Amino acid sequence: MYKKLIVKERDKYLFHIGRSWLNTDDSTNRGDLFDIRKDWGDLPSEEDKVAFLSFIVEKPSLAHFPNEIARLSSLKALQIPVQFLPLSEEQLPKHLISLTLDNLSREEEQADKHYSWNPLVKMENLECLRILGDDNGDLLGISPEVVPNLKWIEVELFNPNTIHIIKEFKCLEAAILGEVGTVDIFAHLKHLNLKIVSAKSPKKGFDYTNISYFKGLEIARLFSIKEEIDCAMFLQFPHLKELLLHQCKKLKNVEAFLEMPVLKSLNIEDAKGISKELKASLKEHIPQCEV
């Protein structure tokens, strides 16, 4: 009746978010991801061990939201279109730890509509929030008062004001941010104990060096940094396990990665001037290395 899919790469951390930052895509922990389509029949029953639920509806609206999902006690992660908002407390599963709101596939006639979370619906168990597409500059109305224990945020900063809401989530440990432009995201979030940071689509002048505020960093992903990166700066992160530098063409002191025994994964794409000998040494010393 339903199409079972393995959890996609972008979801591999969701099941144990806040508990184990790496190696969480083991099949015994992963659960099933269901794509729910309007013409595919009934929802899973209460007895089904469904960990992930994703809705794909041709023309979604709140009227399409199935209240039955509140009975799925095993449900940990839910992905829904923003057209389902606002929801009531009775419509949401109690044990949800991850919520994805999809604002990518908006109909033209809905372009001027502003969908927003019901501020009376609190989600104290929620640890991961992902917004796909425009967050309307206010995280679709989701504030620290609504989600006080949020650990993971994933959103694109189409509106720079969004960063001022994000910095108020006191328990935040992971910030996956796109469309950062020149917003000094690391300076805004320096008071947080971030373990995972990702910055996509920066513009010239973006200050990547402020990543140094996060001494407990375990995973860092930087995309399209225009300025030269001195790789020796990563030596200040004693817990760094995974590093991705994508389309960061100007790198120096790349050999510094040989001095990082904790580093288990290094991915450098489209960088210039790294010798074959150094590439070979990096691959010999780092378990997962693509240079």
Predicted regions and their residues:
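N-terminal basic/disordered segments at the start of proteins
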Residues: 3-11, 15
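Residues that cap or delimit alpha-helices
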Residues: 6, 44-45
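Concave beta-strand-loop units of leucine-rich repeat
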Residues: 12-42, 51-65, 74-87, 91, ...
